[in-house]
């Protein structure tokens, strides 16, 4: 836990405390949209790049230097802890995470051993290096949610609907519970390693949870998300919970226990505030594709997000998903400055402000 960042705008917003301006960071802010990222990672596989402390540190810092965002997010990948726990999984360029033999029975689940902190010592080293470099700028740790990890293991790779995963959840609930429990334990260890090394907050990405109905999410996923987020709460750092296409699940994402609920671009923030129980900050939610439009469109849409974010108890500006690879970095720099320039109007309320302009 890093107390040096407690008074930063990002951490204060996570805790629904007053801030002078809306804090900003971007999912996938360290990624293919940056020329320096492409140069740093040239010729290196993703999971290899995520295993070198110096490389993790450099890539994580790149968007902080370029954009002046209010938080860094650790450069890693959601399947990294699975690889570290001994699973033969890889990220294939242009495809995504792949496993040669998808999980179907108890024997497959038995391949997943517990994750030991020493398995990801390179992550601890990188976090230590980053917190020394970042000073008062918070570092966000992260992990994939257990449902999303299960999707890759059961379907064997990316899919739009993850039919095999849902079929397993419906048809073999005992095996499903065994798999999710194992993934939950791995995720908790991975996040605790990051927090112990100095991460100021964490984000749980359950990227594919939006393919589930609310009732299926409540039965098959929510108990495990609650367990992870309770473990993080006990460590004393704030947490963010996000998934794509989760408009119908926003209330349940909040119920899972995070301090901040991430909202994708499909649900306006002034609508999301009614779907999430009181006591939560909201994060989001500019459509990433808007950044490919002319600047007047970007400015109008960004100001609208800030305006609607004022209806929440607290708001962290972000995109509704990750930065697209062909996004112009200069546009992100300009967007960051724009959001920072809009005053909240009163430091007595994290979620109120004057006109957006």
Locations of the language-model features?
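A short acidic, glycine/proline-enriched capping/turn motif at secondary-structure boundaries
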Residues: 78-81, 96-97, 105-106, 146-148
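Intrinsic-disorder/low-complexity, polar/charged segments
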Residues: 52, 102-105, 161, 294
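N-terminal basic, low-complexity leaders that serve as flexible interaction/assembly modules and, when applicable
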Residues: 1-93, 329-347, 357
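Short, basic, glycine/proline-bearing loop/turn elements
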Residues: 38-50, 105-116, 254
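Short, flexible, mixed-charge acidic loops at enzyme active sites
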Residues: 87-100, 152-163
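Active-site loop segments of alpha/beta catalytic cores
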Residues: 119-348, 355-357
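A gly/proline- and charged-residue-enriched helix-loop-helix capping module
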Residues: 94-132
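Exposed alpha-helical structural elements
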Residues: 6-10, 36, 108, 164, ...
